[in-house]
Each structure stands twice: as C-alpha cells, then as structure tokens.
Swiss-Prot record:
Ubiquitous. GO terms for molecular function: clathrin adaptor activity. Residues 178-196 have a biased composition (Polar residues). Keywords: Cytoplasm, Endocytosis, Membrane, Phosphoprotein, Repeat, Synapse, Synaptosome, Ubl conjugation. A motif (NPF 1) lies at residues 313-315. It comes from Homo sapiens. This is Stonin-2. Residues 427-560 form the SHD domain. The Asn-Pro-Phe (NPF) motifs, which are found in proteins involved in the endocytic pathway, mediate the interaction with the EH domain of SYT1, SYT2, EPS15, EPS15R and ITSN1.
Length: 905
C-alpha cells in the first residue's frame, strides 16, 4: 500500500509519481524531493492497507505488525507489473505541461514525521508516453496499471472518503510543524484502520464543512474531496491504517485551480491534525440527509478564523414560534410562510439549484436518484395538503359510520318486523281467570271473553264479541303495571300465556337484618288476570296496554306526597332494548331489523324535584355541561342517533328539541315509561348463528338445526366478560295435522314428548300411523308446546357453562307420518328465536348523566337489558324418492349428504 511516508510534492502542483521500489524506474514530472526532507516515514509510523497493494522500500524501517510478513511478496508482484524489464529510460517531460494541475493527497489521517526520501525515485523515473488525467501513471508500454498494481494515480470511486490536495507551499508548512505533531499522529494512526466501515454511516453535512472548521465532539473535521474509491476496493477492519496517497479528480482536467469546487486548505490547519472518529459508511443516502450548503464550497476559507459548525434542528422554524394551530387545517400557516420565503429568495434558489445539479453530475456514477417526485409538482402537493380537513367520524351522515346513518335503513324499516303487533285493533279474544280472587273453598278456571281498549284508557270486558254493553269496565291509572308474561296450566293439551294488571304502590321500609337498611318495596294488588293461547294476540295486547299507560295525562300533583321526606332518596333508570328482525338462512345476515328502546323511571325524591337526563345523543356530543357528581359510568364510547322519540306527559319536549336534554318532573314512587325511541342495531351479527335444514322423503320428515356462538358479537369476544343469553327459545312451527304424533298417553292423560340432553324422546305407545317420532338435543330440552303450536327447543343459558363457547349444539327430529298425504302443501318456512340478555344494549344507548335539582346525595341506578326476537329462514331440501325403493338405513346417509352440500362451517 502506498503511504504518505514517501510523498514528494512538485512545485506548483506538478505531477509526481512515487514508487518505493528502487530497482525499477517510476514516472515523475519533477525531481523536487529536496523540498521535503522531513517527510519520510518514521519507525513509529504504522502502515495500513485500504485495498491497494504498494511496494515497501527495502531499506526503510517498518515496525507495523500488520504488513511485516507479506511486504516482500507485494514488492515482487507489483514491481514486475509496474516496470517491465528492458524498458528504456526516457527524459522527464516539460514541467510547464502540468503547472495548472493540483496535487491532491487522499488522506484524512494526521501526517507523521517522515524519513529521508529515496533520491533514485525521481532520477530513474520514466516519462509519460500519453497524458491521462484519470490514470497519469502510464508505463513505457502506454498501458494503465492494473487494479492490483494500485498506483497512486488511480482514481477512487468512493464518494465518502474525503481528502485534500496540498500545494507546494502547504508542504513547507507541514515540514515546519512535523516535529511537534509527529509523535501524536503516529500513535493515533492506528485508530483509523480504514476509511470504509460497514457498520457506520457518513453524515451528509461533512461535504459542506470547511477545512478550517474546529473539531466536533473532540475530533477534527475531516477535509472534503470529490475523490472516490473504486468499487472493487475492500477493506479489512483489522488492518492498521496509514496515510493515503494523493489522488487526482477525474472530472475537469483543464479547470484551473481557482475555479475548482474543492476549497483550499488553510495554511495553519494541515499540520495540526488530531485524532478523529472513523468514517461510518461509503454509501450516502441523499434521501435521508439535509440539504447541502453548496455556496460554502465556492467560498474562500478564512485563514485567521472560521465560524464553528453547529448542528441545527431541521424541524425548528423560529419564525413560526408564535403561530397558533389552526382548527381547520394545522398545515396552512406553515405553507403560507414557506410560500412567502420562497418568493423572497427566488434568485438565490435558482443559483442553488444550478450548483446542486453540478453535484449530482459529480456523484451520479455512485448514487442513484429517485425521479418519482418529479412527476408531481410541489405546488400540487401543497394544495392537496391545504385541503385536508379533520372530519368528525360521528357527524351525521358520515361515511365512516354507515350503520349510524338512518338513510341506509329506510327501505328495511319501512315495514319493520313485528309492526303488525303494535297496530291498533278492535279487540282481542282472551281468557279471564274466574273467580278473580283466590278462594280456598272454590276452584278457579279460565272463561272466554272479548276485551276492548278505548282511547280514553278504559278496558272493557265482553262475554262475546259483538255485544254492545260490557259486563265490566275499569280505567287504567298511572300506578298500574303489567306483570311479566308467564305460562300457566290450561287444560290437558298444554299451557296458556297469562299476565296480570296490578296496582302497585311503593313504600319505604326499614330493615334491621342482617344490618340496618332502608328499602323501597312494592305492594301489588291484582286488578285483572288475562290469558290466551294465541301468542301473537298476547303480544299485541301487551303493546297496546303499554302505549295507553304512557299516554295517560299527568294530573295535578298529589299534595299528600309533596311534603313526604324519604330517609334515602334514590332514582332508578331502566333501559330496555327490544330487537326484532328477519335473518337469512345461509349466512345469518340481518335482512330487516327494528330496535325500540324504552326508558323507565322509578324515583323516591322528597318534595318537588326537577331532573335532567342525558343520553349519548350524537347531537349533544361536545356540548354536555354537567356536574362531576352527575356523570354516570358507561361501558361504551359510541354515540347514537335517536329517531321517532315519544315522551311521557311529565317531560318538557320544548327543552329537548332545543338542547337535547330530557327535563322532567318524575312521578313520586311510581314506575312509568319516560320515553321511547328507535335506533339502528349497533352490532354486525347476532349473539349466535342458527342454521336449519328440512328433509321430506315421502312420509318421513327430518329437521335438524345447528347452533353456534358468533365471534363477531361484541359480548362474545372476551370469554371472561362474556354475557350469556338467557331463556333461549327456538320454535319450530308444526302443522295441526302433526300434533298427534308428539303426544303420548300417560296415567294422568296425554303428555307431550320431551327430549333432554343425551336422552331422546321416548314413546309409551305408537301413534295412529304406527310410527314414532324421535327428537334429540345436545343441550337443553325440546318438546311440543301447545301455547306456541311449535316444537320449542329451550336452553336456559347460552353458552353453556360445561362447554366451550365455540362448540356447536344440535337439534334433530325425525317424524314418520302415516302417508305422504299428511304432508301439507305449504307450511311455515321460518324458525322463531327469542331470548334475553342482561346488562347489554342492542342499541348502545347509555345514560351519561342524571341530575337532580338542589340534591347531591341522591342514589342513582341505571339498569340495562335487551330482548331479542327474530325469524330465521328455514332451508328446505325435498327428496321426492319412491318409498319402496329407499331402504330405511340409507335415509340418514342421504340426509347427511344433503346437509354437507348445503351448509359448511
């Protein structure tokens, strides 16, 4: 490796070729070795290889332990390639031919004290046969040295190895200071083992540094050059570093020194190099660095003093410190400032662009630029960023929440499922419990009647439909409540749906066991008890009574309760969602749905108290003003839209339309419906999926259902917080002709067949047709119920505690009819599903605040519940095969094949 230990500079940057092998001639353009008598290698100077092989003088003292063993082999190989034997000596060329050239020494390490140079290097040098800027060290045969010869004139292709070219006057100053800096530089040279490191990076700002810049981080700033190492050069981090030889720039051979883009080195800086960090990388990524200060390359460096280099923050703009963020577009102020600055500096930007293009030409062989940014102008990108707007995802009609937009459900909700039940009717055929009150001496039974409900709130009872005068009539009051529906024994066929209308009064009572407490208990007095075997009539009557109770006018306040003081004041809010819909048979997609939310209030407040109720209404988002103690905890962050709101008579509707706050004077010790409204279903799927298939083969009918929990439902995602479905009912409608096949005789009369877990339905006797139906379930029970005219598959809790949430459950029924004539031409093509879920909400409606005027110690409670009732389409598979040609053992296989082809989990 050629080092700077034996460098001999020429006068006015003449070309000098240095060769450390005395037996062979070398090219030179001048013999001015006497100007640098002290630039020879010292015994303490260590030598290192940077990927080039150089000849080491046989008489010089070299104590470097990295090149001592192979120096003899390098001398023999390179000397033979540098000068072939028998080449005649030629006189040196004229010195005037290279007077405008610069001698550049590619070395960023300190120069150490050197030993006397070899005089025979210049005396035996061969002249150049052909001038070449990129490869001036031609031998006598006119060929460029090979890559293995590593002449000092070989240009470098590494853009990250900075170097400086030293003039003749610079070398004289170095000779004067070499006595003081030789010791330190010789010791520090071992730290710079290579100018190419694989695990580090070269900062881009190094190109714009001046030579006179002070040390950064305790190390001197490296000089800058445009010289580049060839791509074949490899570096070993374990080698010992040594100064690099001077390298010429291959760009502009005819450019005078004054026009060069490489700044001169100050006279007082070349001899005082100190230890610096290793360069980090050979490849520079221009896309990750700051802009180059091109103007600094053409500036004449100051000899006396230089401004220190400081690292600036590229993201800090001092002119924008007082600019406040814009609520519309936070980037507008920045873009306006940038445009103003760009207009003021249009001339300087043009000059900088031309200089930047020149650098791109310099490094285009080593760096590839991405031109994709040129396809779009800067002004277009700025305009697009200016048009950015921060949208509220919960804004009415926002595209981010299509489920909240009621426009998307207008067609589906035009005739919502279950709307026929709430339509006004002339009356309902019902059953009356006679006698109305229990009596030990007599039994009670059900008697048929006809019930009417007037607009004024009167309930009229008739013996038969069509009579003019009712036998009994009573008025509905605000203290009346409807009991929970239940099933009660009716006759030998089954049970009946029953309900009560009670007069309820709440009283405050003290309890001492197990600890003193105050409770508000309800005392119920039955007014009437009605029942029916028609489930649709039963639901329609309940909805009609609920609507009439809500529309009752609020009479004057009872003065007897105004002065009543409660020991504990409390208010309870019950939020109940009622979901009804139609679900497809294949993928269980919701085709139609209707969600009705009812809010009931029960309060025990002393005196006349005005209350405010706040919901998660989208129209009040960001405008809520409530006290801290009035905020109620919620489990949802969703905002909903309220549609078709209806209020009780105690609510001030004008205040609601103006501020969307529900202001009301609650009824004292009375549970009443405060308001109701419609919303959009907040989930994508239902809690579980149900798929049902039917196979009819002559006189044999098979029905099978698969039930599985849905992972898309929000309450099923976390097994630890999963909310179960309670009182699950799956009803399969049965034609009246098939009812006899689900009954069996017993000691007390006929009973319905019942299937339980791991036990199929057993039959005590054969039916009329001589065949027996079979029912099997993997969870819950299944039996025919006359109250629903259906086979009801009941499950108390879903998912089951003893099974995984994703485990499917199955219902199977096999019915053998007397003949295929018993198969009706058409029957129900859907399955009814009904269940309840506590502590959940189908509409995601939540109470955000409850405020009571002038009261802070009121206990507040909020309860949530949801009731689901929907229909699932029944998938029918008809296999009309001749009965004599089908063996009974093949029916399960045919049914299984049909199921697999139609349903896939």
């Amino acid at each position: 490796m050629t080092t700077l230990d034996h460098v001999i500079a020429t006068h006015q940057s003449e070309w000098v070729s240095f060769n450390e092998e005395p037996p062979f001639p070398a090219h030179s353009q001048g013999g001015t070795e006497e100007h640098l008598p002290g630039l020879s290698s010292s015994p303490d100077q260590s030598e290192s290889s940077s990927g080039e092989n150089h000849v080491v003088d046989g008489g010089s003292q070299d104590h470097s332990h990295s090149e001592q063993d192979d120096s003899s082999e390098k001398m023999g190989l390179i000397s033979e390639a540098a000068s072939p034997p028998g080449s005649p000596e030629q006189p040196p060329p004229d010195l005037a031919s290279a007077i405008s050239n610069w001698v550049q020494f590619e070395d960023d390490t300190p120069w150490a004290s050197t030993s006397p140079p070899h005089q025979e290097t210049a005396e035996t040098a061969l002249p150049l046969t052909m001038p070449c800027w990129t490869c001036p060290s031609f031998d006598s045969l006119g060929r460029c040295p090979l890559t293995s010869e590593s002449s000092w004139t070989t240009h470098s292709e590494d853009t990250s190895s900075p170097s400086f070219g030293c003039s003749y006057t610079d070398l004289q100053l170095i000779n004067a200071e070499e006595q003081t800096s030789g010791q330190a530089s010789g010791a520090d040279s071992t730290d710079n083992s290579s100018s190419l490191q694989e695990d580090e990076e070269v900062e881009m700002e190094a190109i714009s540094w001046q030579a006179s810049s002070p040390a950064m981080n305790g190390h001197p700033a490296p000089p800058v050059t445009s010289a580049r190492f060839p791509s074949w050069v490899t570096f070993d981090d374990n080698e010992v570093s040594c100064p690099l030889p001077p390298v010429t720039s291959p760009l502009k051979p005819n450019t005078p020194p004054s026009a060069s883009v490489i700044p001169d080195v100050p006279y007082n800086s070349m001899g005082s190099f100190k230890k610096r960090d290793r360069p980090k990388s050979t490849l520079m990524n221009f896309s990750k660095v700051q802009k180059l200060d091109i103007s600094s390359l053409n500036r004449t460096p100051s000899v006396t003093e230089a401004s220190p280099w400081r690292a600036t923050n590229p993201f800090l703009n001092e002119t924008l410190q007082d600019v406040q963020p814009s609520p519309i577009n936070p980037f507008s102020a920045f873009f306006e400032e940038q445009e103003r600055r760009s207009q003021n500096s249009s001339i300087s930007s043009t000059t900088g662009k031309s200089q930047r293009d020149s650098l791109i030409v310099i490094y285009q062989d080593a760096i590839s630029f991405d031109d994709s940014s040129k396809t779009q102008s800067h002004s277009d990108a700025v305009e697009k960023l200016k048009q950015l707007q921060i949208d509220d995802p919960d804004h009415f009609g926002s595209a981010t929440l299509p489920d909240d937009d009621p426009v998307a459900w207008i067609e589906l909700d035009a005739h919502p499922p279950g709307s026929a039940r709430s339509q006004p009717r002339d009356g309902w055929p019902m059953m009356l419990r006679i006698p109305e009150k229990k009596n030990i001496m007599s039994s009670r039974h059900w008697g048929p009647i006809f019930v009417k409900l007037t607009d004024t709130g009167y309930l009229q009872l008739y013996y038969e439909q069509g009579l003019e005068k009712p036998f009994r009539e009573f008025k509905l009051e605000i203290c009346h409540e409807i009991s929970e529906p239940r099933l009660q024994n009716y006759d030998e066929n089954g049970r009946i749906h029953s309900l009560r209308i009670d007069r309820v009064t709440y009283k405050e009572k003290k309890k001492y066991q197990p600890k003193p407490a105050v409770a508000h208990t309800a005392e119920r007095e039955q007014v009437i008890k009605l029942g029916t075997t028609n489930y649709d009539d039963f639901l329609s009557f309940i909805h009609a009574v609920q609507d009439r109770l809500m529309d009752l006018p609020v009479l004057s306040m009872d003065l007897s309760t105004v002065g009543l003081n409660y020991l504990e004041e409390e208010i309870t809010v019950d939020v109940r969602d009622e979901f009804s819909g139609i679900v497809s048979k294949g993928d269980n997609q919701i085709l139609q749905h209707h969600v009705l939310t009812r809010i009931h209030i029960l309060s025990f407040l002393s005196g006349l108290a005005e209350c405010r109720l706040g919901l998660n209404d989208i129209l009040v988002k960001g405008n809520e003003i409530v006290l801290r103690q009035d905020i109620m905890p919620t489990t949802t962050t969703k905002w909903i839209k309220l549609h078709e709101c209806r209020f009780h008579g105690c609510v001030d509707e004008d205040v609601f339309h103006n501020s969307r706050v529900i202001l009301f004077n609650p009824l004292d010790a009375c549970r009443f419906e405060l308001m109701r409204f419609r919303t959009v279903f907040a989930e994508k799927t239902l809690p579980f999926t149900l798929r049902t298939a039917t196979s009819v083969n002559g006189a044999e009918v098979e029905v099978q259902s698969w039930l599985r929990m849905s992972t898309g439902f929000s309450a099923n995602r976390d097994p630890l917080t999963q909310v179960p479905c309670e009182n699950v009912m799956i009803r399969y409608p049965v034609p009246s002709e098939w009812v006899k096949n689900f009954r069996r005789e017993s000691v007390l009369g006929e009973k319905s067949l019942k299937a339980k877990v791991n036990r199929g339905a057993s039959f005590g006797s054969t039916s009329v047709s001589g065949s027996e139906p079979v029912m099997r379930v993997t969870l819950g029970t299944a039996k025919y119920e006359h109250a629903f005219n259906s086979i009801v598959w009941r499950i108390n809790r879903l998912p089951d505690k003893n099974s995984a949430s994703g485990h499917p459950h199955c219902f199977f029924c096999h019915l053998e009819l007397g003949s295929d004539r018993e198969v009706p031409s058409r029957f129900a093509n859907h399955v009814n599903v009904e269940f309840s879920m506590p502590t959940t909400s189908a509409s995601k409606a939540s109470v955000r605040s409850i405020s009571v005027e002038d009261k802070t110690d009121v206990r507040k409670w909020v309860n949530y519940s949801a009731h689901y009732s929907y229909q699932v389409a029944l998938g029918s598979i008809w296999l009309m095969l001749p009965t004599p040609f089908v063996h009974p053992t093949t029916l399960p296989l045919l049914f299984l094949l049909a199921m697999l082809t139609m349903f896939a989990w």
